[in-house]
C-alpha cells in the first residue's frame, strides 16, 4: 500500500525541486532555453572580447572602450530601440535586433576576423602616430584595431539589449504574477549553467590539440556556435508566439495586467533627489562604490592575466575557466543567499560584500606589491610563481564579487527601499538607477582612462599603486555608507512596525 505521508512528502519535495506545473512546461522550457542561448552567447562573448582587446591592443584600452565607445553606443542603441518600437510591432522589433547581432557575428567570423590585414590600418603608421601623440595613444591604437573594438562593443551591447531588455521585457509581458514567483528563480538557476557550458566549449575549441580549422582561425567554431545560438533564439521566440501566446491556458492578455511604468528621472532631478535625501544618497553610494571598486581591481587583474597568458587563445581559455567558476559560485550564492538574509541582520548581510571586497582586494594588491618577498617564501611551497598567485587571487576576487552581487548585494539594496514612503521609494529608486547605474558601471573606467590620458607614459604596472589607493578609499566609503544607511534603515523600520 502507498503511504499517504510519503506521497505528500514526495509531492512537496518535487514542487521545491521543480515548481513548474506539467502544463506550464510548454511555456517555461522554451523561455528557459531562450535565456540559456542568450547567456551562452553572453558568456562566450565576455571571454573572447577581452582576449582580442587585451592581447592585441592592451589591457589599458578596456577603460577607454567602456567610457568613450560602449557608453555612447548604448545610448544610441536605446534611441534606435525606442524608434523601432514606434514603427514596428514588439515581435518584429525582437527579430530586427536579434538579426542585426546575428549578421554582425557572421561578418566578424567570416570577414573581419580571418582578414585583419585587409581591414586594419598599417601597424607601423599607428605606432608612429602613438609616439607622436602620446596623450591620445590609446585612442589611436583602438582605431588601429577597430574591428576588435567593434567586437568588444557588440559583446557589451548583447548583454544590455538581448538579456536585460528584450528577453526580460518579453518574460514580463507574458508571465503572470503567480507564475513569475516560480519561473524567475528557476530561470536564474538554469541560465547560470550556460557559464560552465561555455567554459567547456571554449576549452575544447581553442585547445592546441583540437584541429577543427586552420591554426590562425581557431575562433571560427566559437563564432559559428554563437550564430547558431542566435538563430535558435529567433526560432524559439517565433515558436512561442505561434504556439504559446495562442494557448489560453498559458497566455491571456486580459489577465496579464499592464505593468506600471517605472518613474523616470532626468540626470539633474536624480542629483537633486540624492543630495536632498541622505537615505537615498547612501543607497546610491553603495551602487557607485561597488561598480568602481570592481572595475579598479578588474583592470589591473586583466593586465596580469595578459602577462601570464599572452596569446589570444590562452587568454580566452583562461577567461572561459573564469566563467566556469563564476557560474557555479553564482548558483551557490543564489541558493545560500536567502538563508543568510533570513538568519542575520540587514547590517551583517550588507557588510559581507564590502568586507569580502576589501579582504580579497588587499590580498590581490599584496601579491602584486610584494611579489619578490612572496616569491622567496611561498613559491616553493605552492609550486607557483608570484604572477600566477596574483592572477589566481584576482580571479577569486572577481568570482566572489560577482557571485555576492546577485544574491546579497542586490537583495540588501532592494530591502533598503521597503521602509520608504511610496513617493520617495519610487523616485528614490529611479534616481539611484540613473546616478548609481551610470557612475557605478563607468566610474572605474573613467578614473583609469583619465589617468592614462594625463600620464601617457604609465601603463597598469606603473599605475597600480594609485589605483590600489583609490580602491581602498572607495571601499572604506562603502563601509561608511552601509553603517550610515543601517542607522537610517533601523529608524524607519521601527516607525513602520509601530
From Swiss-Prot:
Keyword entries, A-Z: ATP-binding, Cell membrane, Disulfide bond, Membrane, Nucleotide-binding, Transmembrane, Transmembrane helix, Transport
UniProt: ATP binding residues: 436-442
GO MF term set: ATP binding; ATP:ADP antiporter activity
Principal subcellular localisation of the protein: membrane
Membrane topology field: Multi-pass membrane protein
Keyword Transport in record: yes
Residues in compartment: Cytoplasmic: 1-33, 89-92, 169-184, 240-279, 342-348, 401-438, 487-498
Disulfide bonds, paired cysteine numbers: 37-85
Gene Ontology CC: plasma membrane
Membrane-side (Extracellular) residue stretches: 55-67, 114-147, 206-218, 301-320, 370-379, 460-465
InterPro entries the record matches: ADP_ATP_car_bac_type, MFS_trans_sf
Transmembrane segments: 34-54, 68-88, 93-113, 148-168, 185-205, 219-239, 280-300, 321-341, 349-369, 380-400, 439-459, 466-486
Location relative to the cell: Cell membrane
Family matches, as SUPFAM superfamilies: MFS general substrate transporter (SSF103473)
Pfam families reported in the protein's UniProt record: TLC
Family stated for the protein in its record: Belongs to the ADP/ATP translocase tlc family.
Function: Provides the rickettsial cell with host ATP in exchange for rickettsial ADP. This is an obligate exchange system. This energy acquiring activity is an important component of rickettsial parasitism.
PANTHER family: ADP,ATP CARRIER PROTEIN 1, PTHR31187
Name used for this protein in its record: ADP,ATP carrier protein 1
Annotated organism of origin: Rickettsia conorii (strain ATCC VR-613 / Malish 7)
Lineage of origin: Bacteria, Pseudomonadati, Pseudomonadota, Alphaproteobacteria, Rickettsiales
